[in-house]
Amino acid sequence: PIYACTEYDTPAEIADDGTTNTGISTKIHRKVLWINIDGAVGEVVKNSLPADGAIAKMLKNSKYSWTGVSDNRTLSVERNEDPVTWATMLTGVIPEKHSITDESYTANVEYNPNNPNEKVIHYQNIISYISNNDVNMLSLCVTPWAKLNKNMLNNAKTTITSENDVQTRDVVLNHIANEDYTFILADFSGML
C-alpha cells in the first residue's frame, strides 16, 4: 500500500485561523518541524515516545502522521545513507516514480534521444518546492548525510551536515531561538 500524510485530524486549537467576530485577524503562520529518525518507522517512534517528552507535548497543537510512503521499504543491504528512502520521503512519491537510486539524488530516467518531444517527469522535493514558490519561506535542514545535503537539500536557506544527534539537536534549537524558519528538517540516528 501507498501512504501519505494528507489525511489527518486538525486539532481544535488550530482548526480556525481566519478572523474573529471583532475583525481582528487570528491567522496562524504555520511552520513545519520534520523530525526524522533513520531506520525507524512511524509506529515504532510513536510507541517509544516518552509521554512527558517534548515531542509528545507538541502533538496536541500539531498536524502529524505516523505513517509514510517509505514505511514498508526494507533494505537488502543496510547502508549509512539511503537515497531511495530519502527521495521517497522528500518527493512524496514511490521509488518507481521518482527513479532516484543513488547518492547523486538524480533521477535515473531512460529517454529516447531521438525523440526531442518525449516528456520526462522529474518530481520536485519539498525543499525545492518551498524555495521555488516563496523565497521568503526560510528553510533549515540538519542531517549527518553530506551527499543528501549537497545534492537534494541544497535549495534550503541553511543546510548543515551534523556530526551526531546531539549536534543536530543543539543546532536546531539554536536556529529556532534565533531565526524565523518556516520549515525545519532535523535528522537523527536514534532517540536521544
Where are these regions (language model features)?
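Boundary/entry segment of secreted carbohydrate-active catalytic domains
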Residues: 29-34, 38, 44
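Catalytic-adjacent loop/helix segments of enzymes that bind and process anionic phosphate/sulfate esters
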Residues: 117-123, 134-135, 140-192
